[in-house]
């Protein structure tokens, strides 16, 4: 692998994660640039080997520079998959699946809110009523059926968690779904 001398990053990491990122490139000069400061970003990448972006590839980094790798710190590279990016011949990578655990939990959070009528419960609590009509009919997620469209990183992570909650899962994906014998396809 060629020696990496300079890394430019625009990611908004906390101190601990920024320190961990710097340790990936221990010998390199490390330069943080605000993603929205396009002039400084364009200037700093001129002699950089690696650029780690919080967003998509911006035209300001496609000028004259020494970049050998661009990493977009998010899933989905549609905004960076453009002819002018490919023309440079610089590998562009993304972070598919990075947020899958949090997104799965986010889905479950809303599913539970819906099952347990959180809005009604909070309104009753604010009115100092400690019972809600019909609450004896409410039931949780266990035994219910859920549909998941797309079994990429997020869909797989969600399926694993919903299976642990005892849900029946029906899933659809454009590719064969492998390794999930509990899913109805």
Task: Indicate residue ranges for each PLM-predicted region.
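An N-terminal-biased, well-structured beta-alpha scaffold segment characteristic
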Residues: 1-93
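Short, flexible active-site-adjacent loop segments at beta-strand->alpha-helix junctions, enriched
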Residues: 13, 56-57, 76, 96-99, ...
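Loop/helix-junction capping segments adjacent to catalytic residues or to phosphate/diphosphate-binding pockets
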Residues: 15, 79, 100-102, 156
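Phosphate-binding beta-alpha-beta segment of Rossmann-like dinucleotide-binding domains, i.e.
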Residues: 90-145, 160, 172
């Amino acid at each position: 692998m060629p020696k990496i001398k300079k890394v430019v990053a625009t990611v908004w990491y906390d101190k601990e994660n920024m320190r961990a990122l710097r340790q990936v490139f221990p010998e390199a000069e490390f330069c943080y640039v605000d993603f929205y400061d396009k002039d400084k970003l364009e200037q700093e990448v001129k002699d950089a080997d690696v650029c780690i972006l919080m967003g998509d590839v911006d035209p300001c980094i496609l000028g004259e520079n020494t970049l050998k790798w661009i990493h977009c710190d998010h899933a989905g590279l549609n905004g960076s998959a453009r002819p002018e990016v490919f023309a440079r011949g610089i590998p562009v990578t993304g972070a598919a699946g990075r947020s899958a655990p949090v997104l799965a939990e986010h889905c479950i959070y809303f599913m539970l809110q819906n099952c347990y009528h959180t809005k009604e419960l909070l309104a009753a609590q604010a009115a100092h009523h400690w019972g809600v009509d019909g609450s004896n009919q409410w039931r949780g997620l266990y035994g219910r059926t859920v549909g998941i469209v797309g079994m990429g990183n997020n869909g797989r992570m969600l399926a694993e968690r919903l299976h642990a909650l005892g849900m029946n899962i029906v899933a659809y994906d454009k590719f064969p779904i492998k390794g999930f014998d509990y899913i109805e396809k």
